[in-house]
Amino acid sequence: MRSKFKDEHPFEKRKAEAERIRQKYADRIPVICEKVEKSDIATIDKKKYLVPSDLTVGQFVYVIRKRIKLSPEKAIFIFVDEVLPPTAALMSSIYEEHKDEDGFLYITYSGENTFGNFETA
């Protein structure tokens, strides 16, 4: 899936920003969170997040739910490289496994399980 953030910002600028963030906030992970293109779920108000490295995927999903004001009965799925990461996984381990060459971790979200793949821990 194409990232709008990548389309809007050149690689060198993204890489420099991620490096600056990692130097200044060593215990935080730079995350870009974008909606899956054809999903009918609400669009998030901001794409860039500085996530504590000890946050779990489940806790991050909670943050996203709050940002898009998603009601409790509605489902949300987040994907890293088109795969659903384990809810209990730490964001730091997801970052180490899936960070982009520019230094950001790219996460997409959707109201439906559009890809259908689960990552097993």
Swiss-Prot record:
GO terms for biological process: autophagy; protein transport. Pfam families: ATG8 (PF02991). The C-terminal 5 residues are removed by ATG4 to expose Gly-116 at the C-terminus. The c-terminal Gly is then amidated with phosphatidylethanolamine by an activating system similar to that for ubiquitin. PANTHER family: MICROTUBULE-ASSOCIATED PROTEINS 1A/1B LIGHT CHAIN 3-RELATED. The record marks 116-117 as: Cleavage. A lipid is attached at residue 116 (Phosphatidylethanolamine amidated glycine). Keywords: Autophagy, Cytoplasmic vesicle, Lipoprotein, Membrane, Protein transport, Transport, Ubl conjugation pathway, Vacuole. The gene is ATG8. It is a lipid-anchor. Residues 117-121 form a propeptide. GO terms for cellular component: autophagosome membrane; cytoplasmic vesicle. It is found in: Cytoplasmic vesicle, Autophagosome membrane; Vacuole membrane. Belongs to the ATG8 family. Ubiquitin-like modifier involved in autophagosome formation. With ATG4, mediates the delivery of the autophagosomes to the vacuole via the microtubule cytoskeleton. Required for selective autophagic degradation of the nucleus (nucleophagy) as well as for mitophagy which contributes to regulate mitochondrial quantity and quality by eliminating the mitochondria to a basal level to fulfill cellular energy requirements and preventing excess ROS production. Participates also in membrane fusion events that take place in the early secretory pathway. This is Autophagy-related protein 8.
